[in-house]
Amino acid sequence: MKITLTGENSVRLEPTDGPMTIEAPSPDRQYSPFHMLGSSLAYCTFSVLYSWATHADLSIDGMSIDVTWSFSEEPHRVQDLKLTFHWPSLPPARLNAAKRVAAMCTVHETLLHPPTVAIEAA
């Protein structure tokens, strides 16, 4: 699996052989917590799509997933995320089903139904 930092507010996931790598276009580009958030959504979505594709006997050739986000203020936070999957080998008749499957990602559901977060000092 390869995660590429495609911008300050974007990542791309591409399935590759071997261990997961995180790549940046330059050494000064840092993998931020926001890149981690986008990566977790991309990886989770890939996982459910890959599982579905395996059971449906569909090829994932050429698949990639892009996630972009924007910020809001007061308080400073991620305001929205946009996930786009590119799947050239997906039969057009399966596109709507693939979108439904992608929405079943647990990270996606967590973002739609935020958990309670407790902060404590030890």
Regions found by a protein language model. Give the residues of each.
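Alpha-helical metal-binding/catalytic segments enriched in His/Glu/Asp
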Residues: 44
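Extended beta-strand/beta-hairpin segments
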Residues: 1-39, 49-122
